[in-house]
């Protein structure tokens, strides 16, 4: 399945791009994500914990930057992971790019996601997958904005992996529906 997400950051593209390319720096902004190993300068191993409805899943996998165009602020990333309990796998190909905006930069993300095994059954409703992806992206964007405005003290960073909760997901789905009806205004 394919879906698109976007968010804004308070930096112009030339300053936002290096921040987004610093995977180790932004990984803590992604809810439920944890880097476990830097394989090389373009590949990273890690885990991500998510909920699809009532089912908690933890995927261990590899993220690889396949194409990076620093001049045009675009990148293509491939991720693949397997559920820790053997319930299936996920593969994603994502492209993202930065565009100038009135507040700094708009980050546009296009994702093609494939789920297999029991995991595909848990998330068979496309709406649930899109809502989960949107909720993760919204939380990532909010965490990234906070980090850009007030960089954390490295000693105070909480590294515990917490999956996005069903309550948070439901709240974000309702909020996004309201925003869509109001024309995307927050």
Labelled PLM ranges:
Residues 2-8, 43-45, 58-60, 74, ...:
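Intrinsic-disorder/low-complexity, polar/charged segments enriched in Ser/Thr/Lys/Arg/Asp/Glu/Gln
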Residues 5-7, 33-34, 60-67, 92-100:
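Hydrophobic/aromatic beta-strand elements that line small-molecule binding cavities or substrate pockets
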Residues 16-20, 26, 65, 109, ...:
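Hydrophobic pocket/interface hotspot
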Residues 38-82:
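Glycine-rich portal/gate segments that line the openings of hydrophobic small-molecule binding cavities
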Residues 67, 81-132:
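Beta-strand/loop substructures that line and gate deep hydrophobic ligand-binding cavities in soluble
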Residues 120-157:
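A conserved amphipathic terminal alpha-helix motif
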